[in-house]
Amino acid sequence: MSGGTPYIGSKISLISKAEIRYEGILYTIDTENSTVALAKVRSFGTEDRPTDRPIPPRDEVFEYIIFRGSDIKDLTVCEPPKPQCSLPQDPAIVQSSLGSSSSSFQSVGSYGPFGRMPAYSQFSPSTLVGQQFGAVGVAGNSLTSFGTEASNSGTLSQSNAVGSAFTQDTRSVKPQLAQGRSSPQLDPLRKSPTMEQAVQTASAHLPAPAPVGRRSPVPARPLPPTSQKAIDNQEHRRAEVHKVPRPENEQLRNDKRQVVPGVPSAPRRGRGGHRGGRGRFGIRRDGPMKFEKDFDFESANAQFNKEEIDREFHNKLKLKEDKLEKQEKPVNGEDKGDSGVDTQNSEGNADEEDPLGPNCYYDKTKSFFDNISCDDNRERRPTWAEERRLNAETFGIPLRPNRGRGGYRGRGGLGFRGGRGRGSGRGGTFTAPRGFRAGFRGARGGREFADFEYRKTTAFGP
């Protein structure tokens, strides 16, 4: 093989010391490590050669196998390399590329996935040796077709010297031997000392594996390693996105709400505060309040002046009593003693006058009930004016009288006594007497409750 003949691309028949014959295309020859690489290799087994461990032939076609030179028993050239169809020496041609063909070897200028290696169009992907050796940038995965990779790459050039170009590229085989995954299909091949020593020798001279990148003829730039600090900062920023409010969006919303001068703005129904809030009021984003120490009740109570509070409370009670006395007048000639129950209650209150004064709000020896929640110490019937005022405060003032139906339901009084109801019927106004519960139709009140004392004012409508 030293006669200057370019054997690269020739079909080689190789017999190892284990009496196993291989056939493949000569890929590279590494003179430094004394290794030979064959592509598109097929194993024919030991055939009829005498050996202690016969191995049957295999139908698989391996992408490439690297053999140690000292373990090769015989090596013969079966077919010379096919002639290359090169373009004529035309100064107008700057760059050219050949498409994928069915030939066993392409142009020297067609680079494969290893940077400066020839591309083979007919190499079928095999998972056997590809998983054993792997390739730089693939990290253990099986190699794809060299012709496909070469056709996809855009930087292809033409070369004339076939032998010299591949002689310079023999050192580029070493990065191919990246450690990859093993396959059970390689068990018969591992028994061969040629294969084992070739793998050991190649792995011993392996440089540091390059970072994984795209399979292209252009050397991939190694990506800087991502530090843990950068990852933590990125996660922290993502967490702050959900916590920090967005003042810019709120400002834009406020700017959109500004009304143009001279144009009246239509009233809008807010959904819980503002229109863009989606039912949210002024939600505190600061989180729950944190108290540094317990609440001091003694210092808080010392800030209040109990005497002033009691004095203000008694003044309010006196004002209420004066107003109630002025409003208590007999209505329709009725005296307070119309009801025997009221007379009895008033007498009981007179007898049970509080001897301790107004400051004693609760005396458990005297009664179970207290005097705090009671506005008036005397049991009495609510007057018509007071009941009307309570009804107006509770239900509101009607805009106009309803014709044919009762106005509004009266407020219930104390104990079992009913409130006062007003109903407006057709053609008249009916006022229910005391003791009657409100809520009936005014038009029927005059007929159904004729036995009660009532005041009826007849008014003729339009």
UniProtKB/Swiss-Prot annotation:
The modification Phosphoserine is found at residues 182-183, 192, 216, 227. One of its GO terms (cellular component) is mitotic spindle. Residues 232-258, 321-339 have a biased composition (Basic and acidic residues). Residues 283-319 form the DFDF domain. A motif (TFG box) lies at residues 379-399. The modification Asymmetric dimethylarginine is found at residue 400. A motif (FFD box) lies at residues 360-376. It is found in: Cytoplasm, P-body; Cytoplasm, Cytoskeleton, Spindle; Cytoplasm, Stress granule. Residues 149-170, 194-203 have a biased composition (Polar residues). Pfam families: FDF (PF09532), LSM14 (PF12701). Belongs to the LSM14 family. Component of a ribonucleoprotein (RNP) complex. Interacts with DDX6. Interacts with EIF4ENIF1/4E-T; promoting EIF4ENIF1/4E-T localization to P-bodies. Interacts (via FFD box) with EDC4. The LSM14 domain and the RGG repeats are required for accumulation in P-bodies, and the region containing the FDF motif is responsible for cytoplasmic retention. This is Protein LSM14 homolog A.
